[in-house]
């Protein structure tokens, strides 16, 4: 609930912060708008000034035009007056221009400044907008979180309401039980008064123990402080702690302190519960002793009063006493039951508290880990800062180098500027000289104009006075003067042009000067920026140095504080020792008899308490022994299981080895068969090639025979043609003979000749038919041989592909064989490692058994010591009123020391046993994890084997299918029959004979299994 309230408060605070940021953003927006308005105004002003500049330029141009016009007029009439006006106007306009330029420069600077401000404000606005967006998203998330937390609060309130109801009911029951327990408390208060004295003595012991604990805590804190100091005092490490890391460290320290407080509270609770248990056990023992006494009294009473009573009144008294005793016994039994219930409850509470303590210890461990992580982070941060400082130093050096370079450049530019200034001075001097020459020429012009006026006047006078001849001479002189005037004007024009050129050069030099000034200003600005960067870096360095100095001062202060605290502690210890000495002296001055009695009583009580504690510790130790035995049994079972698994693994390894051997054998057989197949294929190839050669030879011979037959046919055709011509001639002769009436003998001869010719013709025709049939058969055989050749070529290509595939598969098989061998080798190595580990575990088990035996022997020794202590206690109880002079305080102190030593030994033994048990548990867990890992590997190997077997089956099926496919087309004839055989006979021969010398099934039969041979996709045995 408190956490939820705190989160709600933080959420509200974040909302307020978001509102403030919104206001800041609105203010910034308003500022931005005002800046934009200012910039607009500036732009307007710039535009206006630009317009005025343009107007001024137009005015200047007009003035220039006017000046030119005035010049022309001056050349004709009043040159000097207009020139003066022009100069005045020119100077005035130049002043105006300079003023306007200055204004323009100032405005441009303002514009640049405003634009920079705008850019900066725009960047800040963008940053604020991004921050606002982030914060809005964070606010939304927080709002959702708050809603969820409110729902959780409602649920918690409902649960709290239910809990309060249940607690109210429980309270009611508890109040009833309290009312019942009130009576018991009255009886217990009496016994409490007796134990108050004991409590006070135990309190004094507790105070002493608390002082010791504080001392130990101080030493621990000193050691903890010394550890980081020792780490920090290392010369190679320089610690620069950032404030965030220090805050985290402080938070972790706070958490640690809270956890320590919780631990101390839990320890106090445990102590209180133990005290309660001890009290209840003591009460139970007292009640049991009282019962035993009552039983003894009753037995003595029955023994003394065996005879029946004489009177009825005595009987009634006895019965009343008996009833009263029975009631007391019942009440005591009830008390005993209640105390037993109380003991059970206290045990339950003790278990809960121990669980809480364990949780707290876990939290402590986590916090310590966090502390360790924070220390590592601080070291990382320090390393980063060191790197940053080194980087900044390098940057500083670079900037200083740049600064020196820029200074050198500025010096060079200054020199250039000085040169330019000198040139400007020279140009100005030249200008002055030109202006002086112009003035001289103007004076000469004025003189010439005066002379012309005088000449005009003299001319008029001469016209009036002299004759025409004088006028002509004067006119010639006037023309000469006019020519000289024109030459002077031309010279003036040339001088004007020179002036304009010099002015342009002056303007160019002025512009170059301005550019140089601007560049110098830029360089100076860059230098200033670099100086500022250097200053910032130096300030950062100074800050870092200051921080480091502050940290060192804090360290020194902490060390001084630690030294002061240690000195105060030592003084306090001295004072304590002095006080203890004074106490001992004062106690010695007291009555020795009373002391001895008190000490004896106290020692008996302490011994009883210690005896009870020892019994409890022995019970705990016995329980722990039982647990250890159970763990040992589990270990043995696990060892048995691991041995069984080892055996199974060994069997599997042997099986794998056998399978590997089988695979090797199978691979060798497969290789041998493949070699045989290869040889068979090569033999088949040679036979096929020889068969092809023979068929080619036959084909060539048949082609030759066909050519011969064609030649014979051509000859026979020629002979037939000759015979036909002869027949025709004979028929004509017959006709002629008939016509000429030839004799019968000639006719008969002719008939015989014609019959012979016909016989020859029929024979030739028969031969032709035979030749045509032979050619047809030869053509058929040729086609068959060509088809067979194509088939053979296809088969050869297929065989070559198959050979390639077989070679590839062979390589793959060899690779897989190597892999399997490597796997077997690795598995052997793993087996060896496992066997070594098993041997180690067996040794550890034996050592654990030895440790257990040693612990059992220690337990027996402790039990014997306990028995001796009990005997001594019983002896002390039997002689409680022995004279005090016999027991000296030294003996009592020795007795106390022995008891303390025994207790310390028992506690140390219990701690050692706990540590050993934890170590054993960790080892067992590690062994279980390793066994699980091995089983996983075994399952993986089994899956791989199954997969390989499936692939082998697939391969086998594919090989058998391809055998069946490849078996049908392999039946063919070895050699061709002779040429005169018919095709039907040839086919019969092919079917009957088959291919001799070549096995009909080229692929070997693979009936056995291919174990461990993987099947690559695409590979086949066809």
UniProtKB/Swiss-Prot annotation:
Stretches of the chain forming a coiled coil according to its record: 89-121, 169-281, 312-377, 411-732, 758-968
Annotated keywords: Cell projection, Cilium, Coiled coil, Flagellum
GO BP annotations listed: gene expression; protein localization; protein-containing complex assembly; regulation of protein localization; spermatid development; spermatogenesis
GO cellular component: cytoplasm; sperm flagellum; sperm head; sperm head-tail coupling apparatus
Region ranges (Disordered): 545-582
Main location (coarse class): other
Keyword Cell wall biogenesis/degradation carried by entry: no
Position of the signal peptide: none
Keyword DNA-binding: no
Domain of life: Eukaryota
Compositionally biased spans, kind Basic and acidic residues: 545-556, 571-582
Distribution of this protein across tissues and organs: Expressed in the testis.
Compartments reported by the entry: Cell projection, Cilium, Flagellum
Alphabetized SUPFAM superfamilies for the sequence: ADP-ribosylation
Functional note: Required for normal spermatogenesis. It functions as a scaffold protein that attaches the sperm head-tail connecting piece to the nuclear envelope, thus maintaining sperm head and tail integrity. May also be involved in the general organization of cellular cytoskeleton.
UniProt protein name: Polyamine-modulated factor 1-binding protein 1
């Amino acid at each position: 609930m408190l956490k939820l309230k705190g989160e709600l408060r933080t959420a509200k605070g974040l909302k307020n912060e978001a509102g403030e940021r919104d206001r800041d953003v609105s203010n910034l927006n308003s500022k931005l708008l005002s800046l934009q308005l200012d910039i607009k105004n500036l732009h307007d002003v710039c535009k206006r000034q630009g317009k005025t500049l343009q107007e001024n330029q137009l005015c200047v141009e007009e003035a220039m035009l006017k000046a030119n016009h005035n010049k022309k007029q001056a050349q004709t009439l009043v040159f000097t007056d207009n020139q003066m006006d022009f100069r005045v106007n020119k100077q005035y306009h130049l002043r105006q221009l300079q003023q306007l330029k200055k204004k323009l420069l100032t405005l441009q600077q303002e514009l640049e400044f405003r634009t920079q401000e705008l850019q900066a404000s725009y960047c800040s606005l963008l940053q604020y907008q991004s921050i606002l967006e982030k914060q809005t998203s964070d606010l939304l998330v927080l709002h959702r979180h708050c809603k969820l937390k409110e729902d959780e609060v409602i649920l918690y309130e409902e649960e709290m309401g239910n809990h309060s109801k249940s607690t109210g009911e429980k309270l009611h029951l508890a109040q009833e039980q309290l009312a019942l327990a009130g009576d018991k408390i009255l009886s217990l208060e009496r016994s409490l008064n007796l134990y108050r004295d004991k409590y006070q003595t135990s309190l004094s012991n507790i105070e002493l123990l608390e002082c010791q604990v504080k001392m130990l805590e101080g030493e621990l804190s000193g050691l903890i402080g010394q550890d980081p100091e020792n780490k920090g005092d290392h010369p190679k490490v320089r610690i620069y702690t950032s404030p965030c890391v220090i805050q985290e460290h402080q938070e972790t320290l706070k958490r640690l302190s809270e956890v320590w407080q919780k631990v101390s509270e839990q320890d106090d609770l445990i102590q209180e519960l133990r005290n309660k248990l001890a009290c209840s056990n003591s009460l139970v023992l007292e009640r049991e002793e009282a019962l035993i006494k009552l039983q003894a009294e009753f037995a003595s009473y029955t023994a003394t009063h065996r005879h029946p009573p004489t009177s009825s009144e005595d009987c009634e008294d006895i019965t009343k006493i008996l009833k009263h005793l029975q009631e007391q016994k019942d009440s005591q039994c009830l008390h005993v039951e209640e105390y037993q219930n109380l003991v059970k409850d206290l045990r339950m509470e003790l278990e809960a508290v121990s669980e809480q303590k364990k949780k707290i210890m876990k939290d402590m461990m986590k916090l310590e880990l966090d502390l360790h992580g924070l220390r590592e982070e601080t070291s990382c941060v320090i390393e980063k800062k060191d790197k940053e400082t080194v980087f900044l130093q390098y940057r500083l050096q670079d900037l200083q180098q740049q600064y020196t370079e820029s200074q050198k450049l500025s010096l060079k530019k200054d020199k250039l500027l000085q040169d330019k200034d000198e040139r400007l001075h020279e140009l100005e001097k030249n200008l002055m000289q030109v202006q002086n020459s112009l003035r001289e020429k103007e004076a000469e012009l004025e003189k010439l104009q005066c002379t012309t006026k005088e000449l005009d006047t003299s001319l008029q006078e001469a016209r009036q006075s002299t004759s025409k001849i004088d006028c002509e001479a004067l006119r010639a002189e006037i023309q000469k003067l006019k020519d000289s005037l024109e030459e002077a004007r031309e010279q003036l024009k040339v001088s004007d042009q020179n002036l304009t050129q010099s002015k342009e050069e002056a303007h160019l030099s002025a512009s170059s000067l301005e550019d140089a000034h601007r560049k110098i200003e830029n360089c100076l600005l860059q230098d200033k920026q670099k100086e500022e960067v250097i200053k910032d870096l130096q300030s950062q360095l100074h800050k870092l140095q200051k921080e480091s100095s502050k940290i060192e001062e804090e360290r020194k202060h902490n060390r001084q504080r630690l030294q002061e605290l240690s000195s105060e502690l030592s003084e306090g210890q001295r004072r304590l020792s002095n006080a203890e000495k004074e106490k001992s002296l004062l106690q010695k001055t007291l009555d020795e008899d009373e002391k001895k009695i008190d000490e004896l009583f106290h020692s008996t009580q302490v011994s009883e308490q210690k005896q009870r504690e020892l019994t409890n510790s022995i019970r705990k130790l016995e329980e722990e022994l039982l647990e250890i035995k159970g763990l040992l049994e589990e270990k043995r079972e696990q060892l048995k299981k691991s041995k069984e698994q080892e055996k199974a693994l060994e069997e599997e390894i042997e099986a794998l080895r056998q399978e590997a051997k089988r695979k090797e054998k199978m691979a060798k057989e497969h290789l041998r068969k493949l070699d045989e197949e290869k040889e068979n294929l090569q033999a088949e190839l040679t036979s096929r090639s020889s068969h092809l050669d023979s068929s080619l030879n036959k084909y060539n011979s048949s082609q030759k025979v066909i050519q011969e037959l064609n030649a014979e046919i051509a000859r026979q055709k020629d002979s037939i043609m000759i015979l036909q011509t002869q027949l025709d001639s004979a028929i004509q002769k017959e006709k002629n003979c008939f016509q000429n009436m030839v004799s019968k003998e000639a006719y008969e001869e002719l008939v015989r000749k014609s019959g012979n010719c016909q016989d020859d013709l029929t024979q030739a025709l028969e031969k032709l038919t035979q030749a045509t049939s032979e050619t047809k058969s030869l053509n058929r055989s040729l086609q068959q041989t060509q088809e067979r050749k194509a088939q053979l070529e296809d088969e050869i290509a297929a065989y070559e592909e198959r050979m390639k595939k077989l070679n590839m598969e062979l390589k793959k098989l060899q690779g897989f064989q190597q892999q399997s061998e490597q796997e077997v080798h690795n598995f052997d190595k793993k087996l060896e490692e496992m066997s070594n580990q098993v041997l180690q575990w067996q040794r550890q088990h034996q050592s654990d058994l030895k440790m257990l035996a040693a612990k059992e022997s220690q337990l027996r020794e402790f039990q014997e010591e306990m028995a001796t202590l009990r005997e001594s206690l019983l002896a002390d109880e039997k002689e409680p009123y022995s004279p005090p002079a016999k027991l000296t305080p030294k003996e009592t102190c020795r007795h106390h020391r022995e008891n303390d030593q025994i207790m310390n030994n028992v506690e140390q033994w219990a701690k050692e046993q706990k540590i050993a048990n934890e170590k054993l548990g960790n080892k067992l867990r590690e062994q279980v994890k390793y066994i699980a890992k091995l089983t996983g590997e075994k399952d993986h190997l089994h899956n791989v084997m199954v997969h390989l077997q499936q692939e082998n089956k697939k391969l086998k099926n594919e090989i058998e299918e391809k055998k069946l496919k490849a078996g049908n087309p392999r039946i063919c004839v070895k050699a061709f029959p002779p040429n005169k055989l018919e095709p039907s006979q040839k086919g019969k021969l092919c079917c009957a004979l088959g291919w001799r010398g070549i096995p009909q099934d080229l692929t070997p039969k693979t009936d056995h299994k291919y174990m461990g041979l993987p099947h690559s996709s695409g590979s086949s045995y066809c």
